[in-house]
Amino acid sequence: MKLKSVFRSVLKYRKTNLSLLLLITYSIITLLYIFDHERYKLNLPKEDEHPEFNDLLETAWGDLQIITASFHPYTSKENDKVHDYLLKRVLEITGNSSFASVSDDKESERSILFQQQDPFNESSRFSRVTYFESSNILVKLEGKNPEEEGLLLSAHFDSVPTGYGATDDGMGVVSLLANLKYHIKHRPNRTLIFNFNNNEEFGLLGASTYFNHSWSNLTKYVINLEGTGAGGKAVLFRTSDTSTAKIYQQSVKENPFGNSIYQQGFYSRYVRSETDYKIYEENGMRGWDVAFYKPRNLYHTIKDSIQYTSKASLWHMLHTSLQLSAYVASNSLDTADQTPACYFDFIGLKFFVISAKTLFYWNCIFLLVSPVVAIGLYLISRDRMTWKSHSWLSWTRFPLSLAAGIIVQKLFSNDIIRSNPLTFSRNYFWPISAFFTQVIFTSYVLINCSNFFFPCADMKSLSIIELFIILWTILLFTSKLLYSSDYRYTGLYPLSIFFLLSTIAAILRLLALALGMRTRKRLGRECRDHHSNYSSHSQIDMERDGQENLEQPQDQFTSSQDDQASIQDDNVSTTSAGPSHNVDEDHGMDSSSQQHDERVPLLKGSNSMEEGLSTRENSLKLEYTDYAWIIQFLLIVPIPSFILFNSVDVIMDALNHTVQEGSKATFDVLRFGMVGSILIALPILPFFYKVNYITISLTALLFLISASKTLLVHPFTNSNPLKVRFSQNIDLSQGNAASVHVLGREGNFLKPMLQDLPSIKYSSTHINCTSVTNGMELCMYDGMQPNLLSTNGNTNISSMVKVHVLHNNRNSTERSPYEPIVAELLLEVKENRACTLTFESRHQAKSPVREITVYQKKNSAPQKANITKTIKSASGINELQLHKLDFDKETYHIGVQWFPKLLTDGNVEDDKLGTKDELSVSISCYWGEYDSESVVNGTAVRKIPAFDELINYAPLSFSFTNEQKGLVIVKDAIIL
């Protein structure tokens, strides 16, 4: 009997029990979160257990150390060294294999000329033509069954000028080498192609060149390995459809990591990056984009090095790609379901997949069936007289308290914008915590104040039903979004799970009422809508403890009579909190509204008073023996809280550093933080008003700490620096001044840092800082001259870029006025690999250029002076990008054809000055080597001393990356 009493006491709906259960729930969620983020570090292969895997990892780590020894962008000589090392490793691995073939684009002098939309800005209408000389290394492993559609594995070996490329994309490259080594030993059933491609960073050009190779016809599937962060776990960033997601599910059994929230965020352009997967997808391939994704403030900086990553991160990508490639290479694939997929993993133990279209159908079923069932049960309970009547005040307090929490949250967010808008960059936990605690604390205060003056007998059940209604509305809206996006909003699945579990909890409550015993006596209104003068001190205390769950005796989830008898131990006060009423037994209506004071029980009418108190007492006792709340709690709180918290963490973990990329991203992150904190709070709001004073005190304390951290702590530290973009621009048409451009977020961050540089502090150098678009700030000053070339004389920067016009028939009398104009240019640039030509006409709205020709002199064919590549565009060409491999080949030979104004608009105008058909050509050439030296007059000097100065003297709370494809840009302009 004692044990039974203890058991009942533990399960009763009390403040302490609820608070303890909340503590346990959030403790478990925290432990699961830590387990999820740390487990992969403990799963490295051991030599005695998995010798082959251990060898693959150790060899890959050694390869990574070698290829990340220096910066190796496409525009550098180090890029060739990495290419040569990879080619050597590929030849070592393939050896004399009878089914392996190697193709080197550099040796075969493969080049392409093609029209390309800006891959990093889909909204751009700038027409671009790109010429690219490739040094991709391709390996073909012919499968046992070559009729099977082949699999491509791809990674790029170039880095940015400011990063060693350990994560982006050294780990992908060495993982490809490990996969190649594995599949050489275990011949695949289907043909595998490995593409070690070059120049992904500035146009996804290596991937584009792949489709100029005959082997591209052999492959249908692709695994792209990428790094858009700097370490951590490699996530399934995106996948083609439900079939490919299920293939990942079936193959990656150890440490799967993926979430379709990333996919939706990436396609929605919340992340301003792109990977080679885009090119493969646009060319009809299906597959998997596996990438590192955080932290973005170290991405493309000097900290993208082997020092800031680990073998655990490398093994996670290597092992994931190995499991996936081995499965695809050896199994027949079911690829029938090509609808977008919703997918997620559970702490790296289990991977779940559902078609977004199927999810939409289930949403429709939920939306249709749930209100029908709920309304039906409500009508049954009304008919059986088991439904409790509630006033409008009772029904509105939960949504109004939620609305008030949102309003207060909005006011707090305004304070963040005013005082510390970039706080998310340092630590998104504090603002999320502040938003979350503020919402639940506001709800607690308002509901309990309302209950103090106007007690509500069944607040929990009302709140659960209202939560169901709110979530039904949200699900309706998100289902519409899912349908209108052609099922590409694949990150909305958490709301479907939350709605389903909340619906079950609400239906169970309504079912209990519908199946309750019919009663003739109605207890009247359980929620008092007016304040009574009669109220004892003990009763007020009990009301504060919560009268919200006065269950009817007929409730299927209430205790037995035995339980009710044992309630005496609880010492529940029997004094009414409101006026005594005589209850009409047939209709449940009050027959007296007489008010009483402390003397009333001694006077006439005391019998009526005692009857009311007795009824009230019995009802209040039932509150403490209500065990249904545990079922409702377990349905609504643990699973939805974990899924919603994990989803918000996924979003913030990927996006929090994007606040450095502009004000739009800042508002996006702030909005996600606000909405996410509300979603995390929703599962506990129906219960939270019931927590004890310790819990609410800790909540208030956590809010104060979180708000202080959010508003007052500086957003940038050594470990979470502000990423700043650098370039040094020399415009030959305006002199030889080497103007340094430093681009970063507004907020008085850049100028104080620049003013402390020695070259500025001890000179009269002026810094000009101006606001540019999207909340960014550009600071410019004249920096130290770069030393791009080794020379024995004075460095003449104007000799770096020279433009020679070989032919121009614009003013030729032999050309008809209706005939296109043709010009031929020779662009002489020293030790260079990349230039851009931009075309513009002062007299025509659109670029009149219709045809571009590139004359290429091949080393392997000296008998052919030039090989021409030509491309035409009826809509006009705005830009020509040039990329060549040979540093010793100092010229680009270009042909340009453009329409005269007469052909484009049909107007015949007098052109006395002969300028209406002029074509302005702006030339920009790029150099990306900075961590090296030139020899000037016998003395070794650094190539870009202005950048060295920033690296050496800027505080550690700053990190630096390139603004454009080179660190030094030399510009010139001519008119044709």
Swiss-Prot record:
Biased composition (Low complexity): 559-570
Primary location group: membrane
Native species: Saccharomyces cerevisiae (strain JAY291) (Baker's yeast)
Key word Aminoacyl-tRNA synthetase present: no
Family of the protein in this entry: Belongs to the peptidase M28 family.
Cofactor: record remark: Binds 2 Zn(2+) ions per subunit.
Single GO BP term: proteolysis
Transmembrane intervals: 16-36, 360-380, 393-412, 429-449, 462-482, 497-517, 628-648, 669-689, 693-713
Gene Ontology MF, one: metal ion binding
Residue ranges, compositional bias (Basic and acidic residues): 582-601
Uppermost EC category: hydrolase
Active site, renumbered: E200 (proton acceptor)
Vacuolar side: 37-359, 413-428, 483-496, 649-668, 714-976
Membrane topology: Multi-pass membrane protein
Cofactors required: Zn(2+)
This protein's name: Vacuolar membrane protease
Residues that hold Zn(2+) 2 according to the record: D168, E201, H300
Glycosylation sites: N96, N121, N189, N212, N217, N656, N768, N796, N811, N866, N937
Residues holding Zn(2+) 1: H156, D168, E226
PANTHER family, per database record: METALLOPEPTIDASE M28 FAMILY MEMBER, VACUOLAR MEMBRANE PROTEASE
SUPFAM superfamilies: Zn-dependent exopeptidases (SSF53187)
InterPro entries: Fxna-like_M28_dom, M28_fam, Peptidase_M28, PFF1_C, PFF1_TM
EC number: 3.4.-.-
Site-annotated residues for Transition state stabilizer: Y299
Cytoplasmic side: 1-15, 381-392, 450-461, 518-627, 690-692
Record-level GO cellular component terms: vacuolar membrane
Stretches for region Disordered: 528-610
